[in-house]
A protein has these predicted regions:
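Solvent-exposed, non-transmembrane regions of membrane-associated and secreted proteins
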Residues: 1-69, 77-82, 90-145
């Protein structure tokens, strides 16, 4: 996966679910992870890719995700030898305790992509960020990888 606007070039690890039914986060700051129960990037409805904002005191793969702007490209190489090219249309911040799962991950009538990381202030007691950053993107083309 490449996101030129924020200098991301990362392979994708497969991610499943945790015991509580939420998506398992990537095991470290790199690489980003694709939720394998969601569609392959470029198929109908949104594919979901998550990455850490930081890890062990160092920037993670999605450290600059909040800096994406509408029009920025995300390129995801697929196992079929094609690359899905997406265009970011918005980036939003949501409180984790009010994360709109249906609005972010729910069905849409086109091929989309959601990039998700942590954001907001850091809760020292919980050792977690209070918010999530979600970038919304739509497929614009496929090309040879």
């Amino acid at each position: 996966m490449q996101i030129p606007a924020i200098a991301v070039d990362s392979p994708l690890a497969g991610l499943g679910l945790q015991h509580d039914g939420t998506m398992r986060p990537p095991p470290a700051g790199f690489p980003a992870g694709w939720y394998t129960s969601a569609p392959t990037p470029g198929q109908l409805v949104p594919a979901i890719i998550a990455g850490h904002v930081d890890w062990a005191g160092h920037p993670g793969v999605f450290h600059n995700l909040r800096d994406l702007k509408p029009g920025d490209q995300v390129i995801v190489a697929r196992t079929d030898g094609r690359a899905a090219v997406f265009r970011v249309n918005r980036v939003e911040e949501f409180a984790k305790d009010a994360f709109p799962t249906g609005a972010v991950n729910g069905n849409i009538d086109h091929a989309g992509l959601r990039l998700i990381t942590c954001g907001g202030s850091f809760d020292q007691q919980a050792a977690s960020y209070r918010d999530n950053i979600a970038a919304f993107a739509d497929l614009v083309s496929t090309q040879n990888a």
